[in-house]
């Protein structure tokens, strides 16, 4: 072998060795894409690990916060255990962000207003879409997924988006973000799927055709669910519910048919029975701090106890996660705002510390603390007559455990023997603090009665946990 050839081969083997030792390439965010679990009930990461969706509603993040403010908000949500941020790409048409950059040319969403370069210090380079790029990447660095709403329902309903424009716009979005692993597409936007149906179908179909690896869902109007229109559509990976913001006695509109009131678990239970099997989630229950019923600011406001109730009710009924929202945060209420919606009287910088925001992580941590993909809702566990509304007990179980949630702290009885073993370990889990207190072992036969800590009242909520010994 001549000396020259030896040097070439040595260099080649050296290069191959280095490449072999290098870690597998990841996306710029270092995050794994999400996919459905094998049983189609839950989400998981690409390597098969459970993913419990704990969302926060940051609808106007893109067009109301600058780069520094976005970092403050996203970092706070990361620290509080959230892993999904729900964001509108286009809230209105036309649309511009805090830097004054327009999203589109004129009012045509099929013509995104883009410029060469993306230097943030150069206003001629840093366009609307560069700002969204930054938000997506920043979220990814913090381990957060972005559930992006391409265009909100109101401008579509008003006729500002044609089916052809929707198709072109969706293709632009799909091709721009299909290599970002921390994206979830949230078609729709507080609207019935039957309203402008062709627009929503074109968006869903085009996203799927050009971006086959990201999950797609549909955000419906209040007191409805995506399954009413799109359950059988190939582009819809999982269902989404907006249980809404009304009290029981406020849910009387003749335009609605379900009238579940505050019983958001009923939407989840209905989706759970559908075929083909698809995961489901309540992605917009009542927001903490918003007036009950939304529009009359003299009404009482929903509290942290209420958002806990919606969370545990829906998850124990079979949902794969839960989305929290706070009135001032969802609209990013700033001191510069000339007006606010729904009686928001607090700046977002303060409202991010609402009590419920810190409590939601306890739900996620609880569900991830036991076997995950085998969990099912099971109301046959509840042996005493099912009470209605706030007194209802929601129960769920896995292979080796049972959980039952009470919002009022009332006594209740469970049918034993649903998991293996002669005895079970019994504990009370506090949704306010995330603390678990073991209180004994009990026989795993017959019916057993349980008395939660404290007095019976709304908001004295507890989770009973029974584990196989």
Feature locations, PLM:
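Aromatic- and carboxylate-lined catalytic core of secreted/periplasmic carbohydrate-active enzymes
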Residues: 49, 269, 276-280, 287-291, ...
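Bacterial N-terminal signal peptides that target proteins for export
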Residues: 1-9
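Active-site clefts of carbohydrate-active enzymes
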Residues: 244-257, 264-305
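Short beta-strand segments
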Residues: 186-188, 217-220, 240, 281-284, ...
């Amino acid at each position: 072998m001549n000396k020259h050839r030896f040097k070439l081969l040595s260099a080649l083997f050296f290069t191959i060795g280095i490449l072999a030792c290098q870690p597998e390439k990841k996306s710029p965010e270092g995050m794994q894409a999400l996919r459905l679990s094998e049983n189609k009930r839950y989400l998981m990461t690409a390597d098969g690990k459970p993913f419990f969706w704990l969302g926060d509603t940051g609808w106007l993040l893109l067009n109301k916060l600058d780069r520094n403010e976005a970092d403050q908000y996203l970092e706070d949500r990361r620290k509080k255990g959230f892993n999904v941020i729900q964001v509108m790409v286009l809230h209105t048409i036309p649309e511009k962000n805090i830097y004054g950059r327009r999203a589109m040319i004129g009012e045509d969403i099929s013509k995104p207003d883009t410029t060469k370069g993306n230097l943030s210090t150069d206003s001629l380079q840093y366009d609307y879409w560069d700002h969204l790029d930054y938000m997506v990447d920043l979220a990814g660095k913090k381990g957060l997924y972005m559930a992006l709403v391409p265009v909100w329902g109101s401008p579509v309903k008003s006729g500002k988006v044609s089916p052809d424009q929707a198709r072109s716009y969706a293709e632009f979005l799909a091709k721009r973000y299909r290599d970002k692993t921390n994206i979830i597409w949230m078609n729709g936007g507080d609207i019935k799927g039957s309203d402008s149906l062709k627009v929503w179908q074109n968006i869903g179909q085009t996203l799927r055709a050009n971006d086959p690896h990201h999950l797609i869902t549909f955000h419906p109007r209040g007191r409805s669910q995506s399954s009413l229109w799109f359950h059988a559509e190939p582009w819809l990976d999982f269902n989404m519910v907006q249980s809404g913001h009304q009290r029981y006695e406020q849910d009387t509109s003749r335009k609605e048919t379900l009238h579940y009131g505050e019983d958001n678990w009923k939407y989840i239970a209905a989706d759970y029975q559908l075929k083909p099997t698809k995961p489901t989630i309540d992605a917009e229950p009542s927001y903490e701090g918003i007036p009950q019923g939304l529009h009359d600011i003299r009404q009482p406001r929903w509290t942290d106890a209420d958002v806990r109730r919606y969370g545990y009710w829906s998850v124990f009924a079979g949902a794969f996660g839960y989305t929290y929202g706070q009135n001032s945060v969802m609209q990013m209420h700033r001191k510069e705002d000339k007006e606010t919606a729904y009686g928001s009287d607090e700046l977002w910088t303060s409202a991010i510390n609402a009590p419920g925001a810190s409590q939601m992580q306890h739900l996620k941590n609880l569900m991830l603390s036991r076997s995950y993909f085998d969990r099912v809702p099971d109301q046959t566990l509840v042996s005493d007559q099912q009470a209605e509304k706030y007194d209802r007990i929601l129960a769920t179980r896995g292979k080796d455990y049972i959980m039952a949630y009470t919002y009022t702290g009332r006594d209740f009885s469970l049918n034993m023997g649903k998991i293996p073993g002669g005895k079970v370990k019994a504990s009370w889990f506090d949704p306010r603090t995330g603390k678990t207190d073991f209180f004994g072992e009990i026989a795993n036969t017959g019916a057993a009665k349980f008395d939660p800590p404290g007095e019976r009242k709304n908001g004295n909520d507890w989770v009973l946990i029974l584990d196989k010994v």
